[in-house]
Amino acid sequence: MYWSILAVGIGGALGSLFRWFLGIRLNGVFSGLPLGTFAANVIAGYVIGVAVAGFARAPQIAPEWRLFVITGLMGGLSTFSTFSAEVVQRLQDGRLGWAAGEIVIHVGASLLMTMLGIATVSLLSR
């Protein structure tokens, strides 16, 4: 149990720091368009796809590694709460089109990247 707690905690800390770094580096690129949040979510989507498919093909890997990568690292990196707050801010500002676009792009790209991650493992495993 202690290894599981450490795996999630350390992974979560590292993922959160990477998300923070992406925000610092990318959120100022386009005014009003939080690219850091988008990058965090699509990167996490891809890596989660790779991880889910990879761990499914390698059940001998200790479960703590799955907890570290998926629950900790990618859980800390991906940010549904920040995405939600940004969309609500657009709605409060009366920017309904921006809010709708952000929802479609974030969710669509994240799902697409997860599928791409799974497909990557599938192709590399042939």
From Swiss-Prot:
GO terms for biological process: cellular detoxification of fluoride. GO terms for cellular component: plasma membrane. It comes from Paraburkholderia phytofirmans (strain DSM 17436 / LMG 22146 / PsJN) (Burkholderia phytofirmans). One of its GO terms (molecular function) is metal ion binding. Keywords: Cell inner membrane, Cell membrane, Ion channel, Ion transport, Membrane, Metal-binding, Sodium, Transmembrane, Transmembrane helix, Transport. It holds the Pfam family CRCB. It comes from the Bacteria. Coiled coil: none annotated. It is found in: Cell inner membrane. It is a multi-pass membrane protein. HAMAP family: FluC. Na(+) binds at residues 75, 78. InterPro entries: FluC. Na(+) is not transported, but it plays an essential structural role and its presence is essential for fluoride channel function. It catalyses: fluoride(in) = fluoride(out). The chain crosses the membrane at residues 4-24, 35-55, 68-88, 103-123. Its main location: membrane. This is Fluoride-specific ion channel FluC. Fluoride-specific ion channel. Important for reducing fluoride concentration in the cell, thus reducing its toxicity. Belongs to the fluoride channel Fluc/FEX (TC 1.A.43) family.
